[in-house]
Amino acid sequence: MHNTNLKYFTSPLNSTTLASSAMLYHSTLRSSSPKSAICGRFSGKSQQVITLSSTGNALYLYSHDGDTGTVTLIHTHLTHCQVREIRAFRLPGLKKDYVIASSDSGVISVLEFRHNRFVSLHKEAYGRSGIRRVVPGEFLAVDPKGRACMLASVEKSKLVYVLNRQGADIVISSPLEAHTSCVTYFVVACDVAYENPVFAAIETPVGETSPGKQLVFYELDLGLNHVIRKAPVDIPNSTSHVTAVPGGTDGPGGVLVFSTNAIVHHVAGAAGGASTGAAGSTKIALPKPAAGYDNVIVASALHQSRDLFFYIAQNTRGDLFKISRDSETQHWSVLYFGTMSCVCTSLTILKSAHMVCLSEQGDSHMMFFESLGDDDAPENVYDVISPSPYLTVTQTLFELKPVFDSVVGVNTTSSDHVGPVPNVLSLISATRGGLKLISHALKPSIIVASPLPEPPSKLWTMRDGAGSDKYIVLSYANATLVLEIGDSVVETTSSGLTLDKPTLHCGSVGSSYVQVMTDGMNVIPMSREGSSESLPATKWTAPSGQVICASSSSHQVVLGLTSSLFYFEDTPGSELSAYDGAYELSSPPTAVAVAPVPAGRVRSPFVAVATDDETVRIVSVDPESMFETVAVQGLMATASSLALLSVGQVLYLHMGLANGVYVRVELDPLTGEIVGSWSKFVGLGRLSVVPVTCGGEESILVSSRGVKTCLGHVNATSDTWVPTGGNSAPFFALDAISGEPLDLAHSFHTQDCPHGVIGVAGSTLKIFTVNTAQKWTENEVKLEGTAKRLIQHDATTLTITQNPDRLVSVDNGAVGITKDLGGPPTSICEVMFGDGKRYFAVGGSRDGSPGTSGTSGYISIFSSSSLGHVHTTEVEAPPLALCAYNGLLVAGIGSQVRLYALGLKQVLRKAQIELSKRVTCLAHFAGSNRVAVGDIRQSVTVCVVLEEDSGHVIYPLVCDKISRQVTCLFFVDYETVALGDRFGGFTMLRIPSEASKLADEDHNAVHLRQLEPTLNGPAHFRFDHVASFHIEDVPVAIHMYNDYLVVCGLLGTVSAFVPVVSPKQSRDLKTIEKFVCASDPGLMGRDHGRFRGYYVPVKEVVDGDMLREVLVMDEKRREEVGEKTGLGVEGAVGRVVNVMKCV
C-alpha cells in the first residue's frame, strides 16, 4: 500500500511585491490578429485555412466547414520570430499542401503540418537576421505548380529558388540571383502551366533622373538554371496592386496591374527572349463611384475552376468588384459587387464558394457567394450598396486590432448576458467602432435554456441501450423529477424510477437503470420502457445504516454507507449482483468514484473513496484482490466530489475539495498507486467534479456552486498546453467557463448533440457545448465613433470617442449617457479634487488633429454622478495625458507637466515644469508625491511634487539612461515603473535607493534645488535597469491583475509578466529555457535571444512561450533537456507547469 501526503505547489505570487522578484515570467495570453491567409489541404484532408498574425509571431490553422461556411481554430503555433510572408504550394504528385515562409531570421523555411503540429522540413539561409531593406523576405511568390519561388527585398535583392523532391523529402536549391538597382513594390508568380516559371515585379529603378514604376518579368530557365530579366514596361506611378492571371489552357496568362481608376492586363513576352517585355496589354474599364472618389485597389482574390475564373477586388473604401473574362469573346468586364464595412488586408476564395476576408481594422468575416451576378450588366457609374447583395456573412471572426486603450478586471457583462467570471482576466479594449469586451474563459454555446419550478439538489442523465441519453433526472428534497428526451423534453412518470423520494445517484448499468436512495438501490430493466409488460424492478436494501454516496459505470456500481463500502457488478450474461462482504471504513464516506470500463475489459480494477477524515483511498475491486487498499492520500480538506477518468493510457483521479481546491492525481493504471498530483484553487465553496465529453475528448467539469465553473480538458493548441503529470502523460488544461456559474452539471449525449453538457444555474436548466480551442469569451459594444481612451468608474466604463467627438458611458453592455465635446479628445481620467467629490477630466484638441503643430487644446470637467458639464479650460496645446494626484489634476501639455486645482469657472494652475519633449503619458503612485512622466523621445522622468510656502513645486528626480519613445506607463510600486515603447519593448525601471531616500527626507527641497541635470536628461539621478523584453507589439496599456502585469498591444496582443520570487526557481527556469532554445532552432531558425532582445537585450525575463516547448516536444528531446538541466524530465516539466498555473 502506498501512503503519501499531498503536496501543494506554493505560488511565486506571495506577499513580496512584483518589483522585488528575482525574475519575471512572460506568457503570451493572446496573439495578435491575423493579417494574411492562405488555403490548402495542409493535413491531406479537407480544405483548411492558415492565417498569419499581424506581428508575424503566430500561425493559426483553421478547419473549414463547407456546409455552414464557418472556420474553427484547431491549432496555434508560436513561431518565436517575425514571419514576414507565407505561401502555400504543392509539388506535382503530392496529395497535400506545404507552406513556405520568410522571416526575420534570414532563413526561408518549408513547413509541413504533421501530428497536429507544424514542423520544418527544410531551412535555407539567404541573408542577415532582422528586417532590412536590402535583405530579401518582404515579398514571396511561388510558382502555381510549386516548382520555384522568388524572394525579394524592398531594395535591390531578388533570389529565386527551385523546389524539388528528393525521395520523400522536399529540398530547396541554392539561390539564383536576380539583383537589380531598384525599389520593389510587388512580386507575383505568373501562371505559365509547365513552361519555364515566370515572376512579375513592380519596380522603380534607382539612379535615374525621373524614375517611374515599371512592370518587369523574370523568367527562370530550368534548363540553364539561370534567371532572365525581361525588358521593363512603364506603368502608372499610381499602381497599387498586381495579381496573376491563369495561363496555359485556363486563360491568357500574364498579370492584372491596378492603378488609380484603371486596370491593365499585361501578357509576358515569348519565352527565352531576354529583351522582350510584355507581348501585349489590354485596358479594362473600372466603374466609377457616383460620389466621385478615386478607385485605388488594395486587395484581390482569384477563384479558378475548370471552365471559368474571376477575381474579387477591393478598393480603399471597401467597394468590391468582380473582374471576369469571357472565354469566347475574350472580353474583360468589371461588375460592382457591393461594399464591405471594412478594408481587407487579405482576400481568399475557397472552393466551397466562401471567401475569407481579413480586415485591416476590426472584425474579419467569412462570406458566402449567394450569386455571381452573371445576369447583371456592368455599369460605368455605381452607387454604394452596403451590404453586398451578392455576399452574405456566414461567420464573424472577432478581432481586437487596433487597440488604443484598455481596462482590466472589470465587469464585462454584455447585451447577450455572458457575464464575468470571478478570478478570470477580463479586458475592455478601445477599438475602431466600439468597445471590445474579452474574458480569458471558454464561451459556452447555449442550445437550450429552460426554467425549472425550483432549483434541484442533484442532476443526472441516463442513456438507453443505443448509447444516447433517454432521461434527465432531477432530485429535490422530497421527490424526484424525470424528464424524457425526444423531439422535445417532457416530464414522464413511466421511467420506472421512484418519484416520491429524493435520489442520491442515477445511472445506466448494463441493460438496466439504477436509482440509489438513502435506504438502498432500485434496478430497473431497460426493456421495461415502452413495453406493455411490466418487468419487475429489483430492490436492494441497505443492511445497516444509510447510503451516503454512490457511483456507477457501464458495468459497476459502488455504494458508500455510513461505515462500509458495497460493490456491485454486471457481468455479461448475468444480472447486477452484489459482491459478498463489504469494505469497512474507519470514517463515514463523503464521495466515491468508479472509473469507466476500459475497452476490451469487463471491469475497472479500482474505485476511489473519500472519507471525512480528509483522506482518499484507492481500493482494488479485482476478484483476485478484492477490497485491498492500494493507496492512501492525505488531503488538506474533505473531498466533496470524486471522479476517475482515463485520458489515453493514463488514469486520473479528480477531486473537488470542500475548501474550493481542485486536485488531480495520476494513478498507475496497473497497480493503482499514486504517481503524481496537481492542484489549483478554483473558488470558495465545495467543488463538484463531473466527467463530460467536449470536442470528442474526455473532459472534467469542475464547479463551485454559484461561484465559478471550469473545464479540464486535453488542449488542442500548443500555446496553452498544460501537462497533468509524468513525462508520458497527455496535456491537460483547466479553463474557466464564462457566463452564470453552474450549480449542477452532467454530460449530455444525443444524436443532435453528441458532445454536450447539461447544467443547472439557479432555477434554469441549460444544455450547451464548449469549443475548447476558443480560449477567450468575446463581446462587443458598438459606438458611433472610434474609442480612444477608457477609464472604469464602479461598474460603468467611460470612454472618449473621435468622429464624433463625445464622452460616452457604457453600463451592462449598453450605451448610457453621451456628452458632446468641443474637439477631438485625447485623454481622460477620474479625479477627486479638494471638495471630496469625484469628477471626470477630459483633454482634447480644439483645432483638428492633436499632432498638428500650433493646435490649441482644452480641459473639460464633468461630474461623475450624471456627467454634468462643470466647465472647460482653454490651454495652448492638447493635453495628451491626464492623471489624478492627491486632490489635484496632473496634465501633460506639450512639453510641460502642470498641476491643476478645481476652480469655479476653470481649473487653476498650481505648478508646472518644462521637460525636453512632448509628454505622452502620466502615472501616479497612489498616496505618494511621485509622478512618472513619459515623453515621445526622452523615455521616463519621475518627478516629486512638494508643497512649499509659495505653493506646489515640481522637481525632476530621476530619468532614464537611454532614450525610449514611451507609449504607456504604470507604477508597479513606490520605486518601480513599468513602461512600453513604440518598438515593442517592455521595460521595468527602479529609482535608486539614494534618490528615493532623498525625495522622502528632503521635504523642504533644500537638496533637490541644488541638483543639476546630467547630460542628456532633465534629472540628476538615473534609473536602475530592472528588466526588459520584446513583446512583438506596441504596448498601449499596462495593468496589474492578481499580482502580475498584463500588457495589451496595439495589434491585439495580450501578454502577462508574472513575478518569480524564488532565486532557485528563477535559475531553473532560465536553465530550461537555455537548453530548450539549444535543442530546437524553431520553425524559422531564429535566434531566440536576439528576437526577444530586438532593440535592448533581454534582462531578468524568462520566455514562457519558449518554456512551453518542453511540454509539446518529442520524448527524446524532452529527455535530453531534462538530462542537460540536471532536473530530469519530471523536474523540468513540473517547474514549467508550476509557473504556468499562475497565469
UniProtKB/Swiss-Prot annotation:
Keywords: mRNA processing, mRNA splicing, Nucleus, Spliceosome. It holds the Pfam family Beta-prop_RSE1_1st. One of its GO terms (cellular component) is spliceosomal complex. The gene is RSE1. This is Pre-mRNA-splicing factor RSE1. GO terms for biological process: mRNA splicing, via spliceosome. InterPro entries: Beta-prop_RSE1/DDB1/CPSF1_1st (IPR018846), Cleavage/polyA-sp_fac_asu_C (IPR004871), RSE1/DDB1/CFT1/CPSF1 (IPR050358), WD40/YVTN_repeat-like_dom_sf (IPR015943), WD40_repeat_dom_sf (IPR036322). Belongs to the RSE1 family. Associated with the spliceosome. Its main location: nucleus. It comes from the Eukaryota. One of its GO terms (molecular function) is U2 snRNA binding. It is found in: Nucleus. Involved in pre-mRNA splicing. The keyword Nucleus applies.
